[in-house]
Amino acid sequence: MNDTYQPINCDDYDNLELACQHHLMLTLELKDGEKLQAKASDLVSRKNVEYLVVEAAGETRELRLDKITSFSHPEIGTVVVSES
């Protein structure tokens, strides 16, 4: 399996940035099939890999942006993440 980070589309990134600024509660679907509801907290970059920092069930998690299939919130609709 190729685990090289694939940057996501700029518009999708902008929507995640907006979600973090407003601490929106997102419904996320990950490429491994996991679904979760989590509050968007921050976007961070380490070693050229970008992560969405979320708070879910009292825990802080970092989700690799290229491992997110989609995210949704009533204010932004459903966004299916595409690679840039």
Swiss-Prot record:
Pfam families: ROF (PF07073). GO terms for biological process: regulation of termination of DNA-templated transcription; transcription antitermination. It comes from the Bacteria. Coiled coil: none annotated. Suppresses temperature-sensitive mutations in essential genes by modulating rho-dependent transcription termination. This is Protein rof. It comes from Escherichia coli (strain K12).
